[in-house]
């Protein structure tokens, strides 16, 4: 138990710290979502792990009860978990408990305030979105929001905008983006997929090795 008033660690670190594939994936997520460090990736992964663990437990209970499925308290728990994930836009409204197992870390990162500010066209880049939030330029329902990592519900998403006293309220402000790219407005494409596509497009073609001329 943590001491009162002392912040306890809200995430789990990787069990094997030197896995090359996992480390490369974490670096991609940090760059794509403009994260401060890998800890923010681990927080999202821990949140996802919690929901997946609950889903596995409920599915195991349903399998043990054979044809009856989930009943009573377990059925209520299943409905509450699904309702919360649907409310935050992490899964679709017609999803069931099985769909939780197919979620990835980027599904959690997509619902961060920082990501939503970029997708709504309130910032030019994901890094600028983080800067606008931490500097107090962004508000939800008129209330200033300064935490880039807070998860945004679908309802609150419609009320994200510039804070009333922010200079960015003026449409002539030079740092205010004119329009949002269509690929960013499409919520079905994750920022990670956008970053990977951009990287593949900018990657120069591999040149074949220079052939050595044989002696005559």
UniProtKB/Swiss-Prot annotation:
InterPro entries: Ribosomal_uS4, Ribosomal_uS4_arc, Ribosomal_uS4_CS, Ribosomal_uS4_euk/arc, Ribosomal_uS4_N, S4_RNA-bd, S4_RNA-bd_sf. The keyword rRNA-binding applies. Belongs to the universal ribosomal protein uS4 family. The keyword Ribosomal protein applies. One of its GO terms (cellular component) is small ribosomal subunit. SUPFAM superfamilies: Alpha-L RNA-binding motif. GO terms for biological process: ribosomal small subunit biogenesis; translation. PANTHER family: 30S 40S RIBOSOMAL PROTEIN, 40S RIBOSOMAL PROTEIN S9. SMART domains: Ribosomal_S4, S4. It comes from Methanosarcina barkeri (strain Fusaro / DSM 804). PROSITE patterns: RIBOSOMAL_S4, S4. Residues 111-175 form the S4 RNA-binding domain. One of the primary rRNA binding proteins, it binds directly to 16S rRNA where it nucleates assembly of the body of the 30S subunit. With S5 and S12 plays an important role in translational accuracy. Residues 194-216 are annotated as: Disordered. Part of the 30S ribosomal subunit. Contacts protein S5. The interaction surface between S4 and S5 is involved in control of translational fidelity. Keywords: Ribonucleoprotein, Ribosomal protein, RNA-binding, rRNA-binding. Residues 198-208 have a biased composition (Basic and acidic residues). One of its GO terms (molecular function) is structural constituent of ribosome. HAMAP family: Ribosomal_uS4_A. This is Small ribosomal subunit protein uS4. It comes from the Archaea.
